[in-house]
């Protein structure tokens, strides 16, 4: 039986090398997003103004709700393409892709018509000043067109990731992120507003969609995507898997986009921007961890297809522990220098509203997202995510209800407390409990393997960082903050190398470094 990727360059045989290579390529793409996001967010805030930036953020939050109509098809595409690719069933790969694309085309046309009719009513839900009414409506339609195209063409990206060609998707991300940053910067410098930025964003997304399809044809040349290969039985199979990821998607929308939507309903639109800035900062940085989770997902699917249970347990422990260790120096820096960072990043006026949210959000993100994201992706890759999806749905329902009561009384500070507490209870405790049950691991042991070593390495670094801030590096300029970050990173990673890395992985790292050093 011919493999669906017969013409693709061979991938290294050792699983550790494959995993590390995939993660590194993912990080390359995310690094570009992080750098451009770090530089562009304050520039957007200053050039568009608080309300303009708030409307920009609000529009993107609304668009995320369109994924309700996906019904889990994209996640099912990644799951089943990874499975059939691992077992060498190229015909089934064609059936999955053809069915997913056909369904997505129908949904895209339907969604475009609905939004065109409902745009005036959507606009009336928010506190938008008269001067921005037309701009908001135009931006909403532009982003809707982009989403409809993405619903279709992102399936090709999912298939590329499913066969573990993260080098390809990362190259696409690097190219399109770079072009978007260049175009946005130029247009803002020339004084253009949010509608012109929306047009530029749509054009850049079209470039990404074209590259997705082009590389899909190169990576999976034997895959045939056509209506005649689509089938309702295949769609039902995808729905049966995807309905739980759909529930998970709906829940994540409520958790990620619910706060800005409700803030925009109860408070002036500018508060959406103040909330969005620290959230986006953390999301940009946590995306490093998210890319490890994506690699964990497809590796888990492949291991499950080959019925290799023992490596799964190690994958669960190592992926989460190393995610936490990688992120910890940045968490320490943002915790200790958060206020100074925001004063330099967006100015004192914006920092007064946005900076107090950061430490509250850090608690939730560190313990529930960074340290446990691979847990959720592992459950997804194994197809054992049903109870996790229900837990996310419960978290989302409680969060929306609580936010409806809290935001009018305590504003955006109350909103971030609600989000962080619920995040820790569900994703920080319930998700790892599900993984421990699924893989027959002791819950206490599983949690200990994740948290004890990274936190132990962090204690002396935190003490030194507080001392440094109180004496020689108070954070009055970017050089001081970056120097403090570099110092924390060097100290922490030196300790983490000895404390967090297992002996086998230390040896693997040393071997890799020697090989790089010996290369001409």
Predicted regions and their residues:
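Hydrophobic alpha-helical transmembrane segments
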Residues: 141, 171-219, 241, 279, ...
